[in-house]
Amino acid sequence: MMAFAPPKSIDGPKMQTKMSTWTPLNHQLLNDQVFEERRALLGKWFDKWTDSQRRRILTGLLERCSLSQQKFCCRKLQEKIPAEALDFTTKLPRVLSVYIFSFLDPRSLCRCAQVSWYWKSLAELDQLWMLKCLRFNWYISFSPTPFEQGVWKKHYIQMVRELHVTKPKTPPKDEFTTADVQPIPGNSPDEKQSPSLAFRSSSSLRKKNNPGEKELPPWRSSDKHPTDIIRFNYLDNCDPELFRLGRRKRSEVTPDFKRQLRDKKNKLQDRARLRKAQSLISLSSPPKVPVRLAWPLHLPVAPSDREAATEALLEHLQKHPGLQSPSPRLQSQS
């Protein structure tokens, strides 16, 4: 028993353990001291190793670890290393996720609904789509049941499909005439006239002969700042013509300001007339007043009396014979 007893003095000259390979198993204080010394020595070695040597050491240590120790390492790595692709809807509260989705346009919400089932349930909430429908005064003519989900989204899609999109109408042939290019008298036949000069001369002659006649629309060159790549949300985009005029007005001040105001006023009046004509055309068409949209299930109205209810139940059972199930009945004995 005396051979395994702990030594009386630890700091003596015989108890220096820095250069020894002895591991005290029965003395906890000496064991902790040896462990700290060897851990510091291992850290110095690890600092001097190359990257490949460090990888080999880490791989060997992970292979020696048990399952619980490997899970511990995994948790530590997740705390130290930030996640590259983290679903914010799983970490943030549901209210904040819905608030973030409320800033998206309808097309982006439809794309978000294709990510996962949870995103689909968030992107089809009535709290998001109801505001987008009420923005254009699109209401539903019924009160949905608590089990109907995504009613306002379907209503928005249906109303967008029913929008009256008018195609651009080509002007009649009588309004525009082709340019009749003729040589100006007085020039020698040998001289060649440029096409632009000939077009200007013919247009000036046509103006003098027919002052009330309309001209051909001017040819528009390619846009230096193309807008074709801009996302096409046609319900949210502003009028490009008004935006262009406002930008030009801010950038430069033209001397003929009255003429620009008059042209702008005429354009606005033309748009108002066009909208009025479109509304008259829509009013002349037969109105469609759906009592209820097509997607909700129509439940049969409960009849008032008992006989009508029995007849409706019998008709329903005849249409669906698989629903009939024999049920035992108790016969009362007289």
UniProtKB/Swiss-Prot annotation:
Residues 194-204, 323-334 have a biased composition (Low complexity). Pfam families: F-box-like (PF12937). CDD domains: F-box_FBXO16 (cd22172). Disulfide bonds: none annotated. SMART domains: FBOX (SM00256). Residues 210-222 have a biased composition (Basic and acidic residues). It comes from the Eukaryota. Residues 86-132 form the F-box domain. The keyword Signal does not apply. Residues 168-222, 314-334 are annotated as: Disordered. Keywords: Ubl conjugation pathway. Probably recognizes and binds to some phosphorylated proteins and promotes their ubiquitination and degradation. Part of a SCF (SKP1-cullin-F-box) protein ligase complex. This is F-box only protein 16. It comes from Mus musculus. The gene is Fbxo16.
